[in-house]
Amino acid sequence: MEKKKVVLAYSGGLDTSVAIKWLQEKNYDVIALCLDLGEGEDLEFVKEKALSVGAIKSYMIDVQEEFMNEYALVALQGHTLYEGKYPLVSALSRPLIAKKLVEIAELEGASAVAHGCTGKGNDQVRFEVSIQALNPYLEVIAPVREWKWSREEEIAYAKENDVPIPINLDSPFSIDQNLWGRSNECGILEDPWAAPPEDAYEMTVPLENTPDQPEFVEIGFEEGVPTTLNGTTYSLSQLMKTLNSLAGKHGIGRIDHVENRLVGIKSREVYECPAAMTLLTAHKELEDLTLVKEVAHFKPMMEQKLTELIYNGLWFSPLKQALVAFLQETQKTVSGTVRVKLFKGHAIVEGRKSEYSLYDENLATYTVNDEFNHDAAVGFISLFGLPTKVYSQVNQKKVEA
C-alpha cells in the first residue's frame, strides 16, 4: 500500500516528535515544517531533529518579517487586546503557520497536514479553520487529540520508539513565543490565586531589579508602521527585537490574565509583551493626534470585533478582511514621532508630533494667541441643545396640565 504524505507543524518538543512516529504507524510519510517566528531557539537543530526522529524531509523557514508585516502589524494598528489585556501572541502566529502548512503540502503533493494541539485549546480551532479556508480539500490530523494519552503514556511510547526526550520535560510550563511576545501556562499558573514564580518570565526583569532611572525612546511611524527607534531605521522584526530588549529591561509588558477561551473554559496565562505593549501605547497616542473625532470614536468598536475574529481563528474570514481594509484606510495620516518614557513597568508617552497633527495650539490655547471664535459658541450651543430643550418643554407642559 502506497504511503500518503502529511506535513506536520513541528516544534521539536515531545508531542510533535512522538507525532512523527505515530503518523508513520498510520502509513504516512511525514514532512516536518518548522517556522522561525523570532522565538530565539536553535531551529536548525530542530530541523535536523525531525529527520533523526523519522521525517522524510524537514523544512525550516524564516518568516519573521512576514509575521511582523502581515500579522503583527494588523494587531498593532487594530489595537487588538483580547478582553482588554491579551495582545494575541499565539493567535497571531497560527494563521501564518497554517498558511505555510498548506503551501508546503501543495508543493509536496501531500494529502494531509497535521498539528500538535490538544482537544481543549484554542489553537486547534485556529489551525483547522485557517486550513479549511486556504485549502478545504486537505485532510487535517491532530495526533495529540486522537491518541488521548496521559503524559506518562506518551513518554513511555517515546522511549519504546527511540524518540529523544527533551531536556526541559520536567518544566511545568507550556510556553509559546514569537516576536510579538511570550505566553506561558500550566504548572502553578493553573491556580489563579498563586503568584507567578519568577522563572515563569524570561523577556522581562522584575520591577525590584529594574533601573532606578527612566529611559526615553522616540518611535517614528509612517502610515501606522513603526519604522525608526531613536532616529535609527529598522525593519519591523529588528525594531521588535531591539524594543523587546529595551522595554523588557524596565519590566514592561507583564500580563497576568484569566481569559475566556473559545472552547468554553477559562484559563489563566501569563504573557510578556514588552515591545508590543510599548508600541500599542505609542501608536494609540499618535492616532489621538491625527485621526478626526468620528474615526477615532468609531475605530474602537471595529477593533473589538477584529480582536474577537483573530482570537477565534477567523483570520481568513471575509469580515476580517473587510475590517482590515477599513483599518488600512485609517492609517494614511498616522505618521509622526512619539516619545516614550520606560520606567518601572510603565511605558508612558511624554510627547508626540506629526505633520498631520489635527491639534492646533492657536485654537486650543487660553493665552493672547487664542484664535478660537468664542462668539460662535452661542449659536452652536443653541442648535446642539435644541432637541433636549424641546423635549423638556413638551414634558413640562404635560406635567403642568
From Swiss-Prot:
Which residues take part in binding L-aspartate? T118, N122, D123
Q: Does the record carry Transmembrane helix as a key word?
A: no
Write down any Gene Ontology CC term. Answer: cytoplasm
The Gene Ontology terms for molecular function here are: argininosuccinate synthase activity; ATP binding
Q: In which pathway does it act?
A: Amino-acid biosynthesis; L-arginine biosynthesis; L-arginine from L-ornithine and carbamoyl phosphate: step 2/3
One Pfam family here: Arginosuc_synth
- Which biological process, per GO, is one annotated for this protein? urea cycle
The answer to whether the entry has keyword Cell division is no
Q: Where in the cell is it found?
A: Cytoplasm
Gene3D superfamilies (UniProt xref): Argininosuccinate synthetase, chain A, domain 2, HUPs, Single helix bin
Q: Which InterPro entries does the entry mention?
A: Arginosuc_syn_C, Arginosuc_syn_N, Arginosuc_synth, Arginosuc_synth_CS, Arginosuc_synth_type_1_subfam, AS_cat/multimer_dom_body, Rossmann-like_a/b/a_fold
User: Where does the chain bind L-citrulline?
Assistant: Y86, N122, R126, S174, S183, E259, Y271
**What EC number(s) are associated with this protein in UniProt?**
6.3.4.5
| Residues noted as binding ATP in the record, renumbered to the chain | A9, Y10, S11, G12, G13, L14, D15, T16, S17, G116
From the UniProt record, list the reaction(s) this protein catalyses. L-citrulline + L-aspartate + ATP = 2-(N(omega)-L-arginino)succinate + AMP + diphosphate + H(+)
The protein's UniProt keywords, in alphabetical order, are:
Amino-acid biosynthesis, Arginine biosynthesis, ATP-binding, Cytoplasm, Ligase, Nucleotide-binding
Family, similarity comment: Belongs to the argininosuccinate synthase family. Type 1 subfamily.
Q: What is known about its subunit structure?
A: Homotetramer.
| Protein name per the record | Argininosuccinate synthase
